Design a protein with these regions (language model features):
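Conserved internal helical-beta-strand scaffold that buttresses enzyme catalytic cores
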Residues: 1-363, 368-399, 413-415, 441, ...
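Thiamine diphosphate
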Residues: 2-10, 15, 49, 113, ...
Length: 934
């Protein structure tokens, strides 16, 4: 298919300025081709040769001859061609920089410099050229040739009106041309019917009407309204309708508090009476739940569109701005995976941002960076920046960011940005039409930058004029978008003042009656569009769960995960690992951690539980223990044995190495797990120390979502932990922080110390219907410790033990009990045997929370003669489990009524988790073990 010159020009990185360079290369090719780089030699050799020609001729002689020809009438044509080129450059300048002169700010206070590139004089054209006709192709005016005056007028209407677009940094030329055509072709202009215009008006009225009603009914109470950004309501309404028309059946929204109440009532269909009850605090909070403020709560409903019914959900969120972004994306990916939506057209994520947060919060960049990765791609996100040009009290651009626009961060993934003036609601809806179609066609992110303002303070009780006196003086006299649009429709004779009054009156009556004011709500919603969580509610943690597995099936699966295709060439390390796994499966070798973990996945997959694992380096494992994916040493192709098992049992096994992010990736996995409870969702930290890079996700979602929003999640966190001389940044998963956050059985914290324990722990998490996050303090050195192994029998016939007793038989001779968790057990046990401390029993507490009071009591009751009991931990005194668990252990001891007190052996209190010198570490560890045993 032939390309036009314009298409070639648009797709090329070359320009007229490179012509001399190309000429010199060509002359070299003709005279001394051996001096050329190979790629240029190939290029010139492949140039087409005219049939019956004399071949290639040096241009130097031709140029010399032309220089000697007298200038004549050709000069006129040269001048015309030159001016034609100038017009093309002018057109391109508007495509590149027209947005910089667009009328985007409703208040007209935005600094807008005059862009010289957009003046005809800058390109060597004059006023005398305005009425001369030039070729434009058909993108601009609808005709091949038109006057410069009309060209400029069209360019200014398209690129410098109340909408501005940035897209010329996009590398894919087909995307650029598509966007260019959407904006420039008159055939693509969206004309609004009377019905369309009145619908927009009604939506604007609902936005302003609810804000005024709440202001009158609840003066001074925080509402975080969208006064000044009322066009957001018709914008969101258009997003839902357009996505539905394009074939989506689910839309997941994420947004902060500003405007949330308005969208809940006017778009999603929350009953006004329910909102008023929240203001009046008529509701009750049951049990240990805390609830949350009304502008953090989620909601869902089904809305009818021309393309069918769409399930719309708004995620609950904290006040921590933008942290909901990856959570929503994870939820969308889970829905797509559940539906088998490989093209990612059925479920659409829509994220609403504030301008200050979008440019300021790092999780935005992390979330954007995930957009085209294999493990986190959701087919493109529609971003809507509610750009009220102020963040609380900060409005000076020199304070809030270092870029021209708050949306410039989106350019890192080449997302097109459509800036639009919120006081032009029709153009706002136009922006939506382009954005939704772009996302649907290219499966990539797109940004709508809604320029607006904040009519009131950060909250309604705040006076913003103290810090922005000029802005709020301007706002005080600025008519609302509803009033402006009303006048426009009256002038166009689509609306009368009487009709406008009736619309406003009817809306207020609906509010007062408490009935729904949203449009197009489904009266009989299709319940197949959401997941039924009923079987996962009110499940207790303490009943025993059968995690055994038939041995014959076990060894059959073990053989499959230890094999690769005959033609597959494993490397030396992987070959050794797979050979050892075959021996473990045959009972020749004891089972190590890596094999046990992989077998946990294999057995669950064979029972049709889907599994998803992400994190940095998870396919191999940071410490080379997992090797869930192996690579052919000759062609580099990967092979995942567990995927074959998943396919055979009609389920999924997804394991992805993540980008180097903790916060966004953990947020994504939380969202995934909170949407699809059927299987096992796992996030592994490279080292447990790095989990605090995602502390906001832990605090605001993982440990508290159930009690704030009644949202369940079965997410598993694998956090490598252990004191092995690697310094303060590679030793501690900060157990103390997780334990401090434990309350009301909100999470599980476990420290498995053997392969059989991790096998049963992972199986328990999937099989048991309780969907509570599981924090696994996983080992590092134990992955290869020959003492940390298990038998096949322990895996196929055993269970997860919250407390593991000492194997000592003569318990009556025990006078001292050491309680511990994790790796330190093996250090203690080794020295205990060397020193023949037969009077000491080592008891491991493998589940730190919920604390196994009864299990510990049962074990301790076997020791009738112990005189001393201590808690031994590797961590410093002020860290680890001591402060959170000494009273729990003591509570168990008090049941025996013998007044024994738990004592501690640990490292001294320290500001950092561990020392940075191996020599000092070994000294400390030796002393710790000696103190515990003596």
């Amino acid at each position: 298919m032939n390309q036009t010159m314009e298409e070639l020009w648009e797709s090329s990185h070359m320009s007229a300025g490179h012509a001399g360079y190309l000429e010199s290369l060509y002359e070299t090719y003709l005279s001394n081709p051996e001096e050329l780089p190979e790629e240029w030699l190939v290029f010139f050799k492949n140039l087409p040769i005219q049939p019956n020609s004399n071949g290639e001729i040096s241009h130097k002689t031709i140029i010399s001859e032309f220089k000697n020809i007298p200038r004549n009438s050709v000069v006129v044509k040269d001048e015309v061609d030159e001016r034609q080129g100038k017009v093309i450059r002018l057109i391109q300048a508007y495509r590149n920089r027209g947005h910089q002169e667009a009328k985007l700010d409703p208040l007209g206070m935005m600094d807008r410099n005059i862009i010289e590139d957009l003046n005809i004089e800058f390109h060597g054209l004059t006023q005398d050229d305005l009425d001369e006709e030039f070729y434009t192709d058909t993108f601009i005016t609808g005709s091949a040739k038109t006057s410069l005056r009309e060209i400029v007028d069209s360019l200014r209407k398209i690129y410098c009106g109340t909408i501005g677009v940035e897209y010329n940094y996009i590398m894919e030329s087909n995307e650029r041309r598509w966007l260019q055509k959407k904006f420039e072709s008159k055939l693509e202009k969206y004309n609004f019917s009377k019905e369309d215009k009145l619908h927009i008006y009604e939506r604007l009225n609902s936005a302003e009407g609810l804000a005024k009603y709440l202001a009158a009914k609840y003066p001074g109470m925080k509402r975080f309204g969208i006064d000044g950004a009322e066009s957001l309501v018709p914008l969101i309404d258009a997003v839902i309708q357009d996505c539905g028309e394009l074939g989506a059946n689910q839309i997941c929204f994420g947004m902060a508090h500003r405007g949330r109440l308005n969208l809940l009532v006017n778009v999603l269909g929350k009953l006004p009476e329910d909102l008023f009850s929240a203001f009046d605090e008529k509701g009750t909070i049951e049990g240990s739940n805390t609830g949350d403020v009304k502008y953090h709560l989620g909601f869902s409903s089904n809305i009818n569109t021309s393309g069918g019914e769409v399930h719309v959900s708004l995620n609950s969120n904290p006040s921590h701005l933008e942290i909901v972004d990856p959570v929503v994306l994870g939820s969308v990916r889970a829905r797509q995976d559940r539906l088998g939506d490989k093209k990612r057209k059925k479920v659409v994520p829509v994220l609403l941002h504030g301008d200050a947060a979008f440019s300021g919060q790092g999780v935005v960049m992390e979330s954007l960076q995930m957009s085209q990765t294999r493990g986190f791609n959701v087919g493109g996100t529609i971003h809507i920046v509610v750009n009220n040009q102020i963040g609380f009290t900060t409005s000076n651009k020199n304070d809030s960011r270092s870029t021209d626009y708050s949306t410039d961060v989106a350019k890192m993934i080449q997302a097109p940005v459509i800036h639009v003036n919120g006081d032009d609601p029709e153009m706002v809806v136009n922006a939506v039409k382009i954005a939704t179609k772009y996302r649907n066609k290219f499966n990539k992110d797109v940004v709508i930058d809604l320029f607006c303002y904040r009519r009131r303070g950060h909250n309604e009780a705040d006076d913003p004029s103290a810090t922005q006196p000029l802005m709020y003086k301007k706002i005080a006299s600025h008519p609302t978008v509803l009033n402006q649009y009303q006048e426009k429709l009256i002038q166009e004779e689509f609306l009368t003042k009487k009709e406008a009054t009736i619309i406003k009156t009817n809306y207020r009556k609906s509010l007062e009656s408490g009935i729904s004011v949203a449009k197009n709500l489904s009266k009989n919603p299709n319940d197949s569009l959401w997941f039924d969580w009923t079987s996962y509610l009110d499940v207790l943690w303490w009943p025993k769960v059968d995690t055994t597995f038939p041995k014959k099936k076990f060894t059959n699966l073990g053989s499959k995960i230890s094999s690769v295709p005959n033609s597959f060439k494993l490397g030396i390390q992987a070959t050794k690992i797979f050979e050892d796994r075959k021996k473990m499966n045959e009972g020749v070798l004891e089972i190590n951690w890596g094999f046990a973990e992989n077998m946990a996945y294999a057995t669950l997959l064979s029972e049709s539980f889907p599994i998803r694992i992400t994190g940095q380096d998870v396919r191999r494992g940071t410490f080379s223990h997992r090797h869930a994916c192996v690579f052919d040493k000759e062609d580099g192709q990967g092979f995942i044995p567990l995927s074959k098992i998943a396919q055979a049992h009609n389920t999924r096994f997804d394991i992805y190495d993540s980008l180097l992010s903790e916060e966004a990736v953990l947020g994504f996995e939380y969202g995934y797990s909170a949407t699809w409870p059927t299987g096992l969702t796992i996030w592994e930290a490279q080292f447990g120390d790095f989990v605090n890079g995602a502390q906001v996700v832990i605090d605001q979602f993982i440990v508290s979502a159930q009690h704030k929003w009644e949202r369940l999640s079965g997410l598993v966190l694998l956090l490598p932990h252990g004191y092995e001389g690697q310094g303060p940044e590679h030793s501690s998963a900060r157990i103390e922080r997780f334990l401090q956050l434990c309350a009301s059985e909100n999470i599980q914290v476990c420290v498995p110390s053997s392969p059989s324990q991790i096998f049963h722990l992972l199986r328990r998490q999937a099989i048991r219907k309780m969907r509570t996050p599981l924090v696994v303090i996983s080992p590092k050195s134990l992955l290869r410790n020959p003492q940390a192994t298990s038998s096949i029998k322990e895996l196929v016939d055993g269970s997860f033990k919250c407390v593991i007793d000492d194997s000592v038989e003569e318990k009556a001779k025990i006078t001292k009990i050491i309680l511990c968790s994790g790796k330190v057990f093996y250090d203690l046990n080794e020295q205990k045997n060397i020193k023949q401390k037969h009077n000491i029993a080592l008891i491991r507490i493998e589940q730190l929370y919920p604390f196994p009071y009864d299990d510990l009591q049962e074990v301790l009751s076997k020791y009738k003669n112990f005189e001393e009991i201590i808690w031994c931990q590797e961590e410093p005194y002020n860290q680890g489990a001591w402060f959170s668990h000494r009273h729990r252990i003591q509570r168990v001891l008090d049941r025996f009524n013998d007044k024994k007190q738990i004592k501690l052996v640990s490292r001294p209190a320290a500001a950092a988790p561990a020392v940075g010198m191996m020599k000092l570490h070994l000294q400390q560890q030796t002393q710790l073990v000696e103190d515990a045993l003596e």
